Design a protein with these regions (language model features):
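Small beta-barrel nucleic-acid-binding modules, primarily SNase/OB-fold domains
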Residues: 1-154
Length: 154
């Protein structure tokens, strides 16, 4: 299955993130959004178009890859906080909420044209996901990460 496509800048809602409260796992984060007029809102965000391995599982292989995906997201968001770049969440959905009540969005840092969502897939930390059946091909992720030199094998 192919990945969902990120919304174009013209057809979406943009939310500026003022604070990253917590990285739950590789595809879910808690943030504080700027709503304008000095109003903010805490929101749980499901990172659109991706599925990462679970870090809370009995499967050791999946758990290791899930922790790696979570750490990758933490690192990217930490870099954003330390720099002068702004983190923006884009969503096409009216209200932006997916089937589990979380904001469903694409994460963009500064003026980047490639979202963090797409980078996760490209660098082998997540599979493309369009809402259908989830895949669990761990070898595919390991191969991509080997090609990037980011896989530490035990």
């Amino acid at each position: 299955m192919g990945a969902m496509k990120p919304p174009s800048r013209k057809s979406c809602y943009n939310f500026r993130v003022t604070k990253i409260n917590r990285v739950i796992d590789g595809d879910t984060i808690d943030v504080t959004l700027d709503l304008g007029f000095s109003l903010t809102k805490k929101e749980r965000v499901r990172i659109a178009g991706v599925d990462t391995p679970e870090k809370r599982t009995r499967d050791k292989e999946e758990k290791t890859l899930g922790i790696d995906a979570t750490n990758w997201m933490k690192e990217k968001l930490t870099e954003t906080i330390k720099g002068d770049e702004e983190l923006v969440i884009r969503t096409e959905l009216v209200g932006g909420v997916g089937k589990y009540g979380r904001l469903l969005g694409w994460l963009y840092v500064g003026d980047a044209t490639l979202s963090l969502n797409e980078q996760m897939i490209t660098e082998g930390y997540a599979w493309a996901y369009d809402g259908g059946t989830k895949q669990k091909n761990f070898e595919e992720l390991r191969e991509i990460r080997r090609s990037f030199g980011s896989l530490v094998e035990s």
